[in-house]
Every structure is written in C-alpha cells, then in structure tokens.
Amino acid sequence: MSVPAEVVEKARKLREEIEFHNVRYYRLDDPLITDAEYDRLMAELLAIEARYPELVTPDSPTQRVGAPPVEAFTEVRHEVPMLSLENAFSEEDLTAFDRRVRKELSRDTLEYVAEPKLDGLAVNLLYQDGVLVRAATRGDGEVGEDVTHNVRAVRAIPLRLKGEDFPDRFEARGEVFMPKRGFLALNERARRSGEKTFVNPRNAAAGSLRQLDARVTASRPLSFYAYGIGAFPDARLPATQHELLESLQRWGLPVSPEYRVVRGAAGCLEYYRSLGERRHDLPYDIDGVVYKVDDLKAQAGLGFVSRAPRWAIAHKFPAEEARTRVVGIDVQVGRTGVLTPVARLEPVFVGGVTVTNATLHNADEIRRKDVRPGDTVIVRRAGDVIPEIVRVVPELRKPGAEPFRMPEVCPECGSAVEAEPGEVLARCSGGLYCPAQHKESIKHFASRRAMDIEGLGDKLVDQLVGRKLIATVADLYRLDLDRLAGLDRMGEKSAANLLAALERSKRTTLARFLYALGIRDVGEVTAKVLSEHFGSLEALMEATEEELLAVADVGPVVSRHIRLFFAQPHNREVISQLLACGVSWEKPAPAPRKLPLQGLVFVLTGTLASMSRDEARARLEALGAKCTGSVSRNTSFVVAGSEPGSKLDKASELGVPVLDEKGFLDLLERGRP
C-alpha cells in the first residue's frame, strides 16, 4: 500500500527533531527536552516505521544509538557495539517482553538479573594483562571518544585489576555517575565562586568526564559501577550474567550492590516496586530498572535488533522531569508571615502525579533562575519533595516577557511587606490581623511567657480558628460558654475554666503585653526594656526612630520592625479591641532617683592596672551605667586599658569617645561624665 504524504512528512520531521536533540544531548551536554519527551518522540517514529517499513532509512535515529562524538577527542571504534536498550514504560510492556523472550527460547520461566538503571555516562574500559589501557564513551554506539586520561582520575575505577584469573584482554562496561551528595557540594562550590551550576547529576558526570584537563575531572566527585562486558574471550565466559558480575567484582571493578537475580515477570515487577519505594534513599540518581536474561547462552541465542539487545530491557520509572509553561506566579503567605512565590503551571504528569504548582522559594531564587510568567520551564519532582522549577528554556520565551517582582503589600491582608537588606525572606508585618498568620499569632499570644492563658493549647486554637469562632487575638475575649462547650473534648466545666483563665489574663504587665503582640525581634528582654523606657503603650506606638534608637538594645533593625508593626492600621485596630475587652496593666511605678551615669552605655577593653574588669563593671553599674560587650552607635564611652582589642578600632570608626585608665578613674571620682 502507498504511504500517505502526511505520514512521510511526519516521519521526516521526527527524524530531524530526534537527530537535533541527539546532538544537544550527546555532543553538547545541553539537552533542551527531558528524557521522557525524547522517549515519546522515538516511540512515535518507531510506531510509524513499524507500520510502514519502507520509511526506514539508513540514517534514521531508530537505526543508530546516539550522535557522533565531539571533535575535541580522539575517536575510538568499539570492537563490540555499545547498544542502547529498549524501554518498558508500563507493567504490560515488561510482561510482553518476558512473554516474547520465553516464547523465542521455548521456556516456561526465566531468571533475570535486575539492577538499577543509573543516570550517568556509559563507558567502555579495555584491560590488558590486568592494566587499564583505554577508556571510551559510548558515543553513537559504534564510535566513541577516548577519555582514558579522565577515567584514570575516577577513583572507583581500578587502574590494575585484583587477582589473577581475569582474561589477558577484555572490555568491561559500566556507568560513570555523580552521587547526590557530591553533586550538591559541587554546585554549592560553584555558586560561591559565581560559576555556572549543573542542572542535574547526569549532566555533571558527563561534563566532568569530557574535560580536556584531567585535573578538573579529578576534582569532581565521580563514581562508577560495572554492569557488563564488551570484547571478551568466549572460552572464559561464565554461564550466567550474575556470575559475570561476581567475576568483575572479584577483579576489583565495583558493581551495584542493589543487583538481584529474580524469577519471571512477577519477580521483575516485585523488584521494580521495591526499588521504586527506596530510590530516593539511594545515594545516587536512577531512572529505572534494567532486566537482563541471566543465562548467557540464552542471551547469545536471542541476539540483537538494529539498536538494542533482544535479551534486555530498561523499565523506566515515571518521569521526574517534564516541560510545561508557567501560567502565572502567585505569592502565598505562610503561618509565620513569610511570603513564598509559587508558579502556577499548565498541568503536567511528572514523578507519577499531575503537577500544577511549583515552589519558587523566594525573590532571590526567582532572579537567579529568571523565571517569568509565560515561560516554558523544566519541572522536577522527586518522591515527596515539593515540585520545583529546574530551569527556564530561554529559547522559547516570548518577546516582552516581564520579570516578576515581589509585592510590596501582603496579598492576604494588605499590610506592608518587610525585607531586611541581606535577607532572602520577605514577611508580612500584619501579624495580629493577617489571616494566614492567625493560628501562630494566637498561640504565641496565649503562651505562658506572654498572656499566660491556661488551658488554651495548640489543638484548641486549631479548633477555634478552624470553626471560625476566632480570627484575631481580640476574639478570644469574646468567647462564651455555649460556643466553647460545643467544641470537641470541651464540656461545660472545661469551658468555664478557660473563660476564667481568659478573664485572669486581662490583668497583665505592659512588658508581657508587648511580647504577646509578636512584634518581630521583640523578645521578652526587649519588651521589658521598652516598657521601662517609654512607660506607656501610647508613647511606644508614637515613638520616632530617634526615640527608639535611644533605647538600650534597640538597633536600627529592631527599631524598623517596631515602627512598621505599629504603622499598620490592622494591628492598631486589634490592639484597640484588646483594650476595649478589658486588657490592662498597672502604670509603671514612678522612676527611682536618677543615678549620675543612668542612660549611658560603656564598653570595657584591655587590662586596667587599678582594678579588674568585673570591679570596673560593678563601679559603673552602681552609678547607673550599663556595660555591654560590643561597640555600637549606642555606646557612650569605651574604657581602654593596656593591650586593647578590636573594640578600640571600632570606637574610632564610629566616633565613640575613648577613656584611658586615668580618665576612667577621674570619671568615677566625679560621679559624672
């Protein structure tokens, strides 16, 4: 029958597209599509050629294994072709493979060697008289690249074999890969040095092995597992694949500790499921399982098709990377007020589930990856890890795509967003009002060191918020017996006890109240200092930056947090409601007689001849001064004895007055500066 013109054109386009991606993957180590997308393209072309055999051409990607080697390396022609494997994407595919093999061998059941499919770079190692003499990459399966100088730098690969029972000349084959821990450390070093990071361990392994300078390869955390042989004298072949692996291991070539001999399709699937459950606990990346007929004579009888052995198959795990489009970027507010950008994605099946969102972590991460709404991106999902965007495909970005900017106000409550210089996290400042922070702000408000509301535990707060009985801390004081008694495990007695505890908590101190508000960086000590310094809530709420900086222990950052918190109308409204509900405290007692050095901050450095540092500190504190361990713009004087440290330099830098020992003694005698 004649082939429809549209099918001929489709096959031509598929061949061109697959060849293009072969070059990107094998020659440039810079793939534009995921393995799953590549497999789909190849499967589509195979299906067309199976239906219309006349469309098969000598240069079709289905008739070869990969792309030609790069020109920077010497070419090596493999004595035995390094073929790729057919893929099984489902249990049905694997069962069909087992059925076909058993039929061709006329056997009721077969044993297979099952082992992890490592995600690295395949290499062929030639040993003569037990010494490694040549190493080559797979290349296009027929011709690879000579990487002997680099493979010698991979510590897991022996330069000389162990024992004496190995053949005089043979080839071992295996996978060079980069363990997860080494990959993370390598990328961290690259980030610190401002260098380009690798997308995944496979790219890192390939890039490391194909360096012209072997010293670079030696610095990379590469490893190796052998999985088979190339050229090998027939007379020395063992009977089975697993005995061959045992021989390789005995000669010093590492093999996967995860390989097993399994029986039939059922044994293969049991191994596949078991390894799939543990794959993320393994120290290296895998993307499936390889099954090989264990009987080597049976392997020889089954032979090969044009691009793969008929006695082996790769059973792929669901793809963990996929390509999709960013529909938009939303900003979520966490329970502590941290703003996290999240990419909304066109639904894509990856890692066994359909993914519609991916975390972008923070503004710095968005800038580093340059993710923009409308971008085409590669998404990764590994196990239970939240899906993340690995990288953007810049070639597919539409003109005029605008960079994303974090909002200046909270998307949940409209309060101002604060982000300190040097910090990657942005936070909502509407702690008392923001719906996203309700539970945490209420739990903190009720805690023992804050308002000390006995009986109001975390689970009860979850119930109250979940049933919409309370939304802010002020709502606690509007609860009644009927609503409380209707909660889980809350009878009338427990409800009455909680109401009594709420009533008691209304009588507090200004320091406790300030701490209970949950102002960022205002802990118990700072709250106490603020209450003593300002004396009233009103004075603190209206304090200027200069007035706040005059308070000991309050620097520019804490001052900014305090002013921003009280500047939010929502926070002020909740505070007004709390006061209207009866929360109160006694006015601070009149300040005691002012001491001569009260309000002054001293820093001691060096050694004093006339007294110890503890004695000097005690003398200063007796006159009302405060002694601290570091110099800041709030420091009034630095007292410098002999052999002063870096504090003296800091004082000079900030313009803080310095007293020598004589000046210090004069000050103590006068009792004033």
UniProtKB/Swiss-Prot annotation:
The record, for Gene3D superfamilies, names:
5' to 3' exonuclease, C-terminal subdomain, 6.20.10.30, BRCT domain, DNA ligase/mRNA capping enzyme, Helix hairpin bin, Nucleic acid-binding proteins
Q: Where is the BRCT domain?
A: 592-673
* Residues binding Zn(2+): 410, 413, 428, 434
The processes (GO biological process) annotated in the record are: DNA repair; DNA replication
For this record, an example GO cellular component is: cytosol
GO molecular function terms listed in the Swiss-Prot or TrEMBL record:
DNA binding; DNA ligase (NAD+) activity; metal ion binding
**What is its cofactor?**
Mg(2+); Mn(2+)
Query: Which reactions does this protein catalyse?
Result: NAD(+) + (deoxyribonucleotide)n-3'-hydroxyl + 5'-phospho-(deoxyribonucleotide)m = (deoxyribonucleotide)n+m + AMP + beta-nicotinamide D-nucleotide
Q: Which residues bind NAD(+)?
A: 35-39, 84-85, 115, 138, 175, 292, 316
Establish whether keyword Chaperone is in the entry.
no
| EC annotation from Swiss-Prot or TrEMBL | 6.5.1.2
Its domain of life reads: Bacteria
Per UniProt, which keywords does this protein have?
DNA damage, DNA repair, DNA replication, Ligase, Magnesium, Manganese, Metal-binding, NAD, Zinc
Main enzyme class: ligase
Catalytic residues, per the record, are: 117
The UniProt family comment states:
Belongs to the NAD-dependent DNA ligase family. LigA subfamily.
Q: What function is annotated for this protein?
A: DNA ligase that catalyzes the formation of phosphodiester linkages between 5'-phosphoryl and 3'-hydroxyl groups in double-stranded DNA using NAD as a coenzyme and as the energy source for the reaction. It is essential for DNA replication and repair of damaged DNA.
- Tell me which PANTHER family the record gives: CHROMOSOME TRANSMISSION FIDELITY FACTOR 18, DNA LIGASE
Stored HAMAP family: DNA_ligase_A (MF_01588)
Q: Provide the protein name.
A: DNA ligase
Encoded by which gene?
ligA
